[in-house]
Amino acid sequence: MAAEKIYEPYKKSRGTMIYTPTNQQMSRGGIGEKLADFVKNLYWVYYIHLPFYLMTSLDAFCLHTIFLVVVSLSLFGLLKYIFL
């Protein structure tokens, strides 16, 4: 039950420490949070780690182009499916 409690920042009567909950404490475990975490992890893997540590510039360019084409076509297909 304690994990479901919404934490509010508060100030103790003594001292100047202000309690701030962690992201894990604030998490509700919904589908929106899982999707946001997936996108954030994908960003870190794709944009940060691969181009700088594992690839040459031509490999990074090809992967970047393919990734953007796939994402763009997927988004277009999803929007077309929803609205038509």
UniProtKB/Swiss-Prot annotation:
Q: Transmembrane helix: present as a keyword of the record?
A: yes
Q: How does it sit in the membrane?
A: Single-pass membrane protein
Any one Gene Ontology cellular component term annotated for this protein: endoplasmic reticulum membrane
Annotated keywords: Endoplasmic reticulum, Membrane, Transmembrane, Transmembrane helix
Q: Which domain of life is it from?
A: Eukaryota
Transmembrane regions listed in the UniProt entry: 63-83
Subcellular location(s): the record lists:
Endoplasmic reticulum membrane
Transmembrane helix: present as a keyword of the record?
A: yes
Task of the protein: Stimulates the activity of serine palmitoyltransferase (SPT), and thus plays a role in the biosynthesis of sphingolipids.
Q: What's the protein here called?
A: Serine palmitoyltransferase-regulating protein TSC3
Recorded name of the encoding gene = TSC3
